C-alpha cells in the first residue's frame, strides 16, 4: 500500500510541470500500472520498481537503466498475416532482430507489427509500454509469448509495468511463477 501512495505522490509532483497532453498520458497509464502492481501483490510476486521519465524506446531507456542491475528486455508485439494470431516476442534489449529472422524462428508464417488498436485490444497497452505484464489483460489467452532462451540464465529481469514511466525488476524464478499463474501459452526459443 505504501508503494502505491508514493507512486501517486510522485505523479502529483510531476503534474505541475506537464502540459495537458503529458498529463493525459500519466493519468491514463496509472491504472494500467496499478493493475500490474495489484496482480503481482495478489500472487505474492516480489519486485523492485524504478520510476523514470517516459521511456518509449530502448535507446532512451538505456541512460536510466545503467545503474539498475537486471537484464533489460525488448518486447515486440506481432500479428500473423491473417490477423487472427498474436505474438509477444521478448529478448535482451541489446540484441537486434530482423522481422524476417523472427518469422523463421517462430514458424508462424508471415508476421507484421500489430497495430496500436490490436495492442490495446489484446494487451490493454499503448506503444512504448509493451511487456509481458500486459498479458494480465489478455483474459482470453489469445497472445502467445516467445522468450529468448538466453533469458533463462538471467538472475533478474526488467520490464515496464504497462507504463513506460517505470521499470519493474523481478527475479527470474518469480517471473516464471508469474507466467505459470497467468496461464497462457508461452515457450523459450533460441532467437539469436
Q: What role is predicted for each listed range?
A:
Residues 2-7:
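Acidic, Ala/Val/Gly-enriched low-complexity intrinsically disordered segments
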Amino acid at each position: 500500500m505504501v508503494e502505491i501512495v508514493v507512486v501517486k505522490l510522485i505523479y502529483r509532483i510531476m503534474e505541475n510541470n506537464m502540459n495537458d497532453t503529458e498529463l493525459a498520458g500519466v493519468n491514463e497509464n496509472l491504472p494500467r500500472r496499478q493493475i500490474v502492481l495489484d496482480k503481482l501483490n495478489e500472487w505474492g510476486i516480489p519486485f523492485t520498481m524504478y520510476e523514470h521519465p517516459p521511456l518509449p524506446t530502448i535507446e532512451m531507456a538505456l541512460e536510466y537503466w545503467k545503474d539498475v542491475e537486471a537484464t533489460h528486455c525488448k518486447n515486440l508485439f506481432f500479428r500473423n498475416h491473417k490477423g487472427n494470431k498474436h505474438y509477444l516476442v521478448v529478448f535482451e534489449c541489446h540484441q537486434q532482430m530482423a522481422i524476417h529472422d523472427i518469422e523463421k524462428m517462430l514458424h508462424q508464417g508471415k508476421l507484421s507489427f500489430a497495430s496500436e488498436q490490436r495492442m490495446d485490444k489484446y494487451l490493454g497497452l499503448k506503444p512504448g509500454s509493451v511487456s509481458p505484464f500486459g498479458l494480465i489483460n489478455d483474459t482470453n489467452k489469445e497472445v502467445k509469448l516467445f522468450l529468448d532462451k538466453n533469458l533463462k540464465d538471467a538472475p533478474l529481469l526488467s520490464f515496464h509495468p504497462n507504463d513506460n514511466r517505470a521499470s519493474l525488476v523481478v527475479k527470474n524464478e518469480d517471473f516464471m511463477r508469474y507466467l505459470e499463474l497467468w496461464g497462457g501459452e508461452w515457450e523459450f526459443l533460441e532467437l539469436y
